[in-house]
Amino acid sequence: MLSKKQQRRLIRSAYGTSAQFIKAIKRMYRSADRQIKGEISAFLMSEVDWSSPAEKDDVEDAVAELKQFDSSVAPLVAFYTSSLLLGHPKQSDLVTARVAVPLIKVGQSLHEMMQRNGKKIPNDVSKISKEQAVQTPRLHQIPYNYNIELQQNSSQVIVQHKGISDNVNRNIHQAITRIREVCQRAAQDTDAKRDYAKDVDRILTGKDGSGGASAQAEMIMRTQTCHELNQATTADFKARGVSKYRFLSLEAVNSCEDCTNIDGNVYDIDDAQEGVNLPPMHPNCQCWIEEVEDTTDDYGNQ
């Protein structure tokens, strides 16, 4: 069983890294915001018609830019290149691809952050668990096949990782779609042309700079950190033969009622289910679980 000191160390490690990633996310969205407004401004100044045919060289350049990304954002790349390669691409398809590039770049960076989280947090949990076993070998036992058991239990969460990855790409796609609509209005309406920059800001960073697609990405990162921490902790418990865990609600003024209501409740590890009795219970959840010491003796007595 981890000491309170080791628990705090693990929490700081997981959410400290997450906080650094969130700062980076804010910077990336601000940068994308500037680039996208630059692309829209250039398009509007060119005074080309929204529905007119795109030049072949411009299309080839846009396709080349889109194809520089890795497989994590392949669905996004395929979607935006298809409109340039199939049929007769228009200026609208071209400008959409150009505003998509900065956001797909953000999406790729988000995937990289989550992959790092997905490796770092389980490694930290395993490392601290082994250190605790050295300090208190009777209370925190590590079996000889711990690493094998840990790997088997950890491999069961691959499908959940896919769902988180889909959320990132969906968030990026929705932002691009909304920006395309802003660009179309600006191209076809004089009043909208004056306001497009504010509209792009609202979509990407929110009205006051703390919302929009950036806030959605930050939420995904916090939720994924909580997911990784609790899945890694659960895998550690199963590998060490721990049978029960206690739900620990985030000790903060913004803790939700559902999490607060089950704070301290004890559950069987085999019954653990994310969103029911295992964090994350909801987006932005930062709750955790701790081991419940088995007080049963060799004869089954408490």
Description of each model-found segment:
Residues 1-205, 296-302:
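N-terminal leader/targeting and assembly helices and adjacent pre-domain segments
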